[in-house]
Amino acid sequence: MSKEGVSFKNRDRFIQLGIAISTLRKLRGMSQDQLAEKANMSRSHLSAIEAPNMIRSFSLETLFNLADALMITPSDLLNTSL
């Protein structure tokens, strides 16, 4: 595992999820600051999740908060293919 706790096997999944979050945020006309505030997290943490070159694992609570803030179900967020 890497220092962020993401195994190589899951690396691409976290990259895809970060890209999906970023794309949905932009489609909704939200800045990182706005989404981070609605999802109860720091902008720097959100930025790290969205960045494809910084693989960052995160909790289910964070996933649920992001999904709620993006007005999408967690399962739809996980199944988003953008």
Name these PLM-found stretches.
Residues 22, 33, 64:
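Residues within the helices of the helix-turn-helix
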Residues 40-56:
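Recognition helix of helix-turn-helix/homeodomain-like DNA-binding domains
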Residues 21, 35-36, 46-49, 77:
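Conserved hydrophobic/aromatic packing and binding residues within compact polymer-binding modules
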Residues 71-82:
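Short C-terminal boundary/hinge segments that cap the last helix of small helical domains
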Residues 25, 36, 67:
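The alpha-helix within a helix-turn-helix
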Residues 2-27:
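A short, Lys/Arg-rich alpha-helix, primarily the initiator
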Residues 53-68:
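Short, basic-rich loop-to-helix N-cap that marks the start of a DNA-contacting helix
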